Amino acid sequence: TDGCEEIILAVQYNAPDKTNYLIGWECFPTKGWGGLNPTQSLVDAFEDSEGAPISKSKIYSEKNPFANRDPRLEVNVLHDGEEMYGVTIKVAPLKSSGSTGIAQHGDATATGYYQQKWLDPSIDPQSAGWEMGKDWVTIRYAEVLLTYAEAKNEVSPLDDSAFEAVNQVRRRVGMPELQKTDATKPTYCATQDDLRQRIRNEWRVEFALEGGKRQWDIRRWGIAKDVLNAPFLGIKYKMVDDAVNADPKDGGKVCVLYEGDNVKLAGSRYEDHNLS
């Protein structure tokens, strides 16, 4: 459907009975609503372009965090300095505009990031019509591959077919293949748990922001309580002196991104989500 061979099951767009709407976002200047905000944890889950987690990367830079990364990061996450709908996104120009230095008002991002996946750049979010005219994808081929890889690794640790299945997903986006033969490379998986954790991360980045799939993953893996009890973090920033560019209300300071401390948002209690 929609001309994509990867789609296995979808809810087809059929106006006026079945429609889908543009996922809005909010930045300065205003263009929509920012109700879905990727967390820092999700942003950090995307590997560097050599296949290393950023915590072990030799090419990752905190001051330029979107450079040399898994290309799916840019597909999923809108960030400061990008252009969308004819405007340049500025997520944190003023401290005085919000308690975290991020939000411009109630509809703005709370984390410093916006959702990019599902945005349709051909639609003006300020126009009268918000319908995307797109089918809603329920199952696509990557889900079949990762389901197989996960299950095969559990019953037959480090099986070649498990590697092949997960690597089909990675090859599609130009990411280095996971492997078990060369310990000098960041893609090396020495144990069943090594491959297990890489497959789990592949689920997260491949299906990021896709209709709540993440909640079923963390339930299946038995880690929901840990994940949902952890604090939500947003982008790193600090306030610096800048008498020329600062708003008087900000005491002569402007916000510089990717330095200082992460924005810490309200936490989430596992029990609030009624998960068992």
Feature locations, PLM:
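Nucleotide-sugar donor phosphate/pyrophosphate-binding loop at the beta->alpha transition
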Residues: 31
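C-terminal, active-site-flanking charged/polar segments
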Residues: 38, 43
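Acidic/polar-rich alpha-helix caps and helix-coil junctions
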Residues: 1-25, 34-37, 48-276
